[in-house]
Amino acid sequence: VIYMAQLKMFWINDKKVELLPLPEGYSFSTYKDEADKAAWVECCKNGLVGDDTKPEFFDDCIAGDEHCNPCTDCFFLDYNGEHIGTITAINQGGIGDMHMVGMKTEFRGKGLGKYLNNMCIYKLANEGVSHIYLTTDEWRKGAVKSYLTSGFLPVQYEMGMEERWEKVLEEYGIDSVDMLYEDCTLYKKIYRSSLAKRVKIGVVGARRGQTMLNYCKTGFNCDVVAICDNAPDFLAGAKEKYGEDGITYYDNFDEFIKHDMDGVVLANFANEHTPLAIKAMKAGKHVLSEVLPCQHMKEAVELVEAVEETGMIYAYAENYCYMPAPREMRIQYREGKLGKFEYGEGEYVHNCEPGWHGYSNCDPEHWRNTMSAFYYCTHSLGPLVHITGLRPVKVSGFEIPFNDRMYRMGAKAGAMAVEMVTLENGAVLKSIHGVGPSRNSVWYSVYGSKGRLESAREDDSDKEGVGTLFGNLDSYEGENNDNPKEMDTSDSLSKLAEDSGHGGSDFYTMYHFIQAIKGNRNAEIVDVYEAMDMFLPGHFGYLSAMNNNKSYDIPDLRDKAQRDIWRNDTTCTVKEKAGDMYIPSYSKGNPEIPDEVYEALKKKRENS
């Protein structure tokens, strides 16, 4: 099932309304008695109701609304005494509802819809409503055009709406129209597709950046204009795949950042994002950073302050937040259906041995071989933080020992890590992640005062793992009604995202970043503060593991006073970044891995 939200439109009551004079032979009447129910159904066929709809449906749809009085609110447009069209104008406590606008087939295409709209607007405006809303669909072309002509404006209330309306305007030959938010404030003026400004994007990292490049090349709201990579082979491969029409290629970031573009995607090495992000923002570019946001606390402080000082958009591409199950978990929690948040678990464990020779380039000093087990924590922890919006305040870390698999991979760290995190409301999270387990698992589970939500396990071959969500929720606290069921995880972007990487989640990170650049305050990005809330539990979790699992407070980098404490702290596992604050990547001291291991990995790479 592909979910597609209806279009929503508002008419703002800020102008005087007069009734339009009707053509000869036409008049208005209101609902009078039972006989009008059948006429109402006939007017609503061909789109609003099925051909077999009974007159009794009027009671459910119109008369059953507690705010509706059919005798004053349900209008008929009559031709020579026959009901040929209908509209219902309901005052929903100061907000107008234009409801069930229908016209008999033989009277369509005559421009009569404007008279129905006008009657509804006139009635509700004179009752003093703040605005009138309606919902409709693109395929009701005549109706949509008549609403626009009557002064209704599109509403940006769900992702994908702007692009859908651009297509509508293009089809109708309308150059532009104002678009509103749901609170009736102006979002911005939007333009037909052929006139809409496309966001210009540059991508750093031609390998991991391919998903972002593909989005830009096939997407509907941006173009890739520059690609940067210091690896000649990767840059040449990108040039062959994406061509040179409209794209400039760079092997130097400082030259790349001078290019005329709106935003930059950082898909380079995970421990090298911060310096490039800061340079980009200071050059006036918005930034989408792949995981991870920074290497140590000094970089964390510098990154936060660069965002604050420049005012540029920083979005953290924690794509697992947008996997179907955690994405829907967030919606359910934010709508209050889970109740008060109490506990959550996140797993991102990945047996990387089969591909490690490619991931790490067989290099003993590659960042993947020198990271602690705690470093790559945001795939497991990030979705839980994003679901709740709650800040982590304490963490205790536990390290799973270095094992034979990690030895064979040449990775100098524990096989996995566990963070036990306390949130600001007292709830607890368990996050487990790592590259050295024997099997894979991506899984999330959250508990609230009204029940539980969790994704399917990967080993359940009948389900789609993190693409499947199970819910067992009470309608109120204390109901204790055990009612497990599989839940729908589709939304208005699911169809567009289905061919994108990581279960479609890569589409969402790019889409929301582009929407943020375009000024949409509803864009669901992970900002720099939330990125730190996802990263810091891993950083301090490792310090905990090195100190007998001692609990560590997690700083709030929104607070400058707390930033000052960590401003010069370079504690990390990369020698050239840490200086005299260097710590080993394994809590018991870095394991000795002979050169022969890396030579064997090189042979494996050559033969693959």
Regions from the language model: what does each represent?
Residues 18-54, 174-189, 216-222:
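Short amphipathic alpha-helix that is part of the acyltransferase structural core
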Residues 103, 109-126, 145-149:
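Conserved acetyl-CoA-binding loop-helix of GNAT-fold acetyltransferases
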Residues 45-104:
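A conserved beta-strand-loop-helix scaffold within acyl/acetyltransferase catalytic domains
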Residues 207, 313-315, 320-411:
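Predominantly a Rossmann-like dinucleotide-binding segment in NAD(P)-dependent oxidoreductases
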Residues 1-25:
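Acyl-donor-binding surface of acyltransferase catalytic domains
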Residues 192-243:
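N-terminal Rossmann-like dinucleotide-binding module
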Residues 244-306:
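Beta-loop-alpha module in the N-terminal Rossmann-like domain of NAD(P)-dependent dehydrogenases
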Residues 319, 423, 450-526, 564-608:
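C-terminal glycine/acidic-rich active-site capping loop/insertion
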